[in-house]
Amino acid sequence: MSTHKNFDKICVAVLIVTLLLTLLFINGEKLGIRVIVDEDAQEDSPADHFTANDLNADWDASGATVITLNGSSASISGSGAYMNQGDLIIAQAGSYVLSGTLTDGSVVVDTTNGSKVWLLLDGVDLYCSEDACLRADQAEKVFLTLADGSKNRMESGETYSQTALDDGTGGVIFAHDDLSINGSGSLEIVANYKHGIDANDDLVIAGGSLQISAPADAIHCNDSFRMTDASVTLEAGDDGLAVSGAQGYVYLRSGSLEISSIGDAVHSAGDVILEGGSLTLNTSDDGIHADSSFSMSGGDLSIPQCYEGIEARTIELSGGNLSIYCLDDGLNANGTDAGFGGFGRDQQLAVDAADSQETWIHVSGGSLLVVNESAQDADGLDSNGDITISGGTVLVSLCNSGTNCAIDYGSESGGVCEISGGTVIACGSYSMAEGFDDSSSQCSVLYNINSGASSGTQVSLLNSSGEALLSWQVPCSFSSVILSCPEMTLGESYTVQVGDQEEAITLEEISASFGDAASSMFGGAMNWGGMQPRGGQAPQGNAGGRPDMGQAPDMGDRPTPSDGEAPMGELPTPPDMNGMPTPPEMGDMPTLPDGEGPMGEMPTPPDGTEPAQAEPAADAAPVSVTVSGTSSLLIGACGLLLLAAILLALRFRRNG
């Protein structure tokens, strides 16, 4: 009997300990309980798109395997790598230093899942006639570091082998898994077949200078493209930078990105997020196309040449400087894939996307300049839903001869156009002019000009003391202008100056209209018979979501250079906007021109020797993150249930 009593006491003690552990797990976050995890395996949060390893280009290479390439052979000092029929095989996790030349072969990373590989390129020249120069067939993540001061080059042939094609190989660099590039050296990539870099998962560029030319996409990845502290130049026969996954995104924190492309300069099946850096985009199609959202909170984005500037379902500008020279809309918020246009895209008719998805343009900060000197029907800001402006500076100049709107919103589908802050000077044609709604909280003026105004005309708004609240030398001819700034007040008198003409006005309503455009400036009575529906809806019979404009504008001949670079041709120089007067208090105008976790099992090279474990990078130490409260609760509850079941079984056994 005493034995049973002692056993009962032990069971009670275990039960009490289990309850305490369960409470500890449930309150783990408050008590600071932490667990060791692999930081590169974690999904990046929107607040931090880069891991410590992505940003560390100074990892310790003292224990790395050193490889010197020599034509079709290599000198290897260390373990984990071997040559196989002219290809360098990286067969185990760890760090490697590469230099020299491969005349016709690939560097192939083929390790176990969960393995990480660091490659330091220190003067590498790779050529492969029928496959990728660098393949990441299997690894959790590959870190490619460009050694300080080094010059590296990779070039592929014009056709790939059937084996490479069967594997889906589409780039000079091809990665099945995550790829991260950093360092302070340079890398030139010349693709003669398809893409420059083709990554199935995430691509991070966190340093170095990259020049990539390709007949298709210069960079193509599935999950995400993230860039900081790098200088990247892309030339592409199709899209410059493309992210194809529906949940994918493009993220730029800092650095310099220059793109010349025939297709979209930047194309994302998900989002595009710009927080800093400098972008210059020259393209025959969209400057930036995002199937979901575009947001810009900092940096400088210049699009000197494009068909359409930025196209997305939602567009938000909260900071930075954005300038667009376009042939069609500057900003276009359209709600579905079917509503997106562009040269070379699927032949789809546009629809009124406001009926299916919420669309909007919101400007709360930064500066926006849109200039369209073409005479076609186009809009400066075009939304199938709402347009709201609460801050920043918006300047729009559209050619007077087209039936365009400086600001066009989906009024027919319930959209609103409101201003509550910021500065706006938006010039275009009188025939389709739309002002801000009466529901706005900041005053505005829609002013129509009785004789039209030629390009270069100065537009100003003066207060009752003769001080200029707004002033801009407008690049294109115009017959209508929208003016708004925080200093405008109901009941006050102002003077609108257009060149040598001026008119005194008094603001008696929040959104006022003045002036009178004479029909003679349109060559007689205006022809409304061919007017297209507003709100971004394309006419029937024309694909791509734009009015019928005949042949695409001539972008110039694009000869193929003898060195195999993608045909880019000469790009026109954008209009010179230097020397323009800066409106008072409008801000700067856009300038125109880890040792983390197990390293896995290592395959044995063909010579039969067992490779030793290479030393990991210096920063390969695991990092800790807080366990979620939900996970802790589940762990504790499961433990408690398991213990209760054991005690119950023992009790039945004893009584039995």
Could you say what each language-model-derived stretch is?
Residues S2-G656:
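A composition-driven surface/loop motif
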